[in-house]
Amino acid sequence: MLRPSEQWNWIYCSTKDRLLLDISDEAQFCSPFTSSQLACKPTQQPLSMAEAQAFWQIDDSLQQLEMPAAVRLELCLTALCAHYLQQQAHKSWYFQQGADCSAKPFELVMLRGLSGQYALVLSSETDCVTCLLLGDISTLSGKQLKRLQVIRVLRNRISPLKLDIPFRHTA
């Protein structure tokens, strides 16, 4: 797994119309976010210490789910991009009422429409949370929301994640 570095830089690429993270001369992460979704378009914005710390918190949360390291890395880097996204209206009507949980940033939660899906809380307000969808989900209206989409919902639409944690993770 890659380790965050002060050498990493956020940039907006107009050719690709994407937010990118320059990792090295040979590696670059291309986010799924276009200019219309961004609040600002960075040029050589170094990765901050807070972002590096968030990277490790996100990775730690995602380790609760069984997934390959490459997928976990993609989710970590995509979640870090949320800092550059525009604020959005909530999409609570797409989801069933949940348990009104008090999830904090970087915790995993469950959203339920016609299907259920894991989501990573990116930011938290008194009555809303902004989440990154970890997989596709079918909403109550039948609309498909795609993996890696960032959505904002009322807290009463999320439920805490309940996983059976293997004994090796509890010692």
Provide a role label for each language-model segment.
Residues M1-P105, M110-G116, S138-K143, R147, ...:
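Mixed-charge, low-complexity intrinsically disordered regions
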Residues G116-L132, D136:
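Short beta-strand-centered aromatic/proline hotspots
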Residues L148-L163:
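Structured surface patches comprising rigid loops and adjacent beta-strands/short helices at the edges
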